[in-house]
Amino acid sequence: VVVENGIAAIMDVAGFNYRPHLYQYAYDKLPQQIILGSETASTVSSRGVYKFPVTRQSMKKYDDHQSSSYDVEHCGWSNLPEDDWLWHNDKSWAIGEFVWTGFDYLGEPTPYYTDWPSHSSLFGIVDLAGLPKDRFYLYRSHWNKDVETLHILPHWNWEGREGEVTPVFVYTNYPSAELFINGKSQGKRTKDMSVTVENSADSTSMANFKRQQRY
């Protein structure tokens, strides 16, 4: 609306909340030709809680009122961190973001709005106790190249999942990582720089975590 009515055109910088899918449209329309993510992500997660199967979910609810720390769940209006980063990396006019949010806080327990006794948000990169969630290391690996980041999840010893395949995620600012279990290589992954904001926007790419493969 603010693009069409001219309000965004008179601002020094046009900011968009949870609208990366409108960035190109706004860039083509606005005279400033710079776009800021003034509120982004709202990925939800609970520190140390991992849900299976690992699938991208919107407004997913569980009986324990938690969200998966695999960092693949978000709100109906929001997205995952990589959805924003692709714009910043691929388009020089997408100048950055303010992530919602740094710390969990009391209130807005999305997606458990009406589910007693939920009362804490799940948006935070850091939890209510000030302890980093897995997502903290994802952001650090992307934002802070001066600090070595090599973070693996979930827990290494998963009682009750014997004989099952447990997905392993690694957040690192190294170009590649290799996973070893009991001294045996399980394979090596290299960041896929061929993934772009344009070739990863379809539903199949989203479901297959194509965007995550770049980071």
State what each model feature region is:
Residues 1-193, 197-214:
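Extended substrate-binding grooves/exosites of carbohydrate-active enzymes
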